[in-house]
A protein has these predicted regions:
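A structural signal for multi-pass alpha-helical bundles of membrane permease subunits
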Residues: 1-199
Length: 199
């Protein structure tokens, strides 16, 4: 119990060294993982629905962008991204992290797109004959039909964001998470926290 009460991370806030304890670390972690996982699940689902439902010429371009970003490493983007978030005023905020994670690029887009293509269009057509809007068709018919894919993608995103300590360190330096605290634990000299089974 002493080890848990001493579990903390020291960060600089307003030029002062501040200790962030387990309660705040857990709160930051849950806000980070839940919001980011939700954003990273909803964005590809919406874009995948639009590209699978409507045949635009631009769909091929979107698919190409997704594939290219999966194949080519984007090295050196952090400096530009930090500058952009500072310019927009969303650096070091949770809402800024949510905006950053609200993107459709990646494997989840392809997974959602193939799932939406597997849904029979007769359901949407019959709903539209009854007067349902396109938004209603998307939210009430197509999304519930692939709930299992939503749950799988959301769970994978949760696990990924739970273990991610570098992104909060870079983009939210004043809101450390438990993952970052566990990373910092290997460098501590506190005798209550250097007990080997704890590490």
């Amino acid at each position: 119990i002493n080890a848990i009460s001493n579990f903390k991370v020291e960060i600089f806030r307003d030029g002062k060294l501040v200790s962030v304890y387990l309660e705040e670390l857990l709160l930051n972690s849950f806000l980070y993982i839940l919001g980011c996982a939700l954003a990273a699940t909803i964005a590809p689902a919406i874009v995948a629905y639009a590209t699978s439902r409507f045949n635009f010429r631009f769909n091929v371009v979107l698919d190409g962008i997704v594939i290219v970003t999966m194949v080519l490493p984007i090295i050196g983007q952090d400096a530009a991204l930090i500058q952009m978030t500072k310019t927009l005023g969303i650096y070091d905020t949770m809402i800024g992290m949510y905006f950053m994670k609200f993107m459709f690029l990646g494997f989840n887009y392809l997974l959602f797109k193939s799932s939406f293509r597997g849904v029979d269009k007769a359901y949407a057509e019959s709903a539209q004959l009854d007067g349902a809007s396109e938004l209603r068709v998307m939210l009430s018919i197509n999304f519930p039909m692939i709930t299992n894919i939503f749950v799988i993608v959301f769970t994978i995103q949760l696990m990924g964001f739970w273990a991610d300590w570098t992104t909060p360190l870079i983009y939210m330096p004043h809101s450390p998470t438990v993952a970052y605290a566990l990373y910092e634990l290997q460098f501590t000299s506190d005798p209550l926290l250097t007990f080997k089974p704890l590490q």
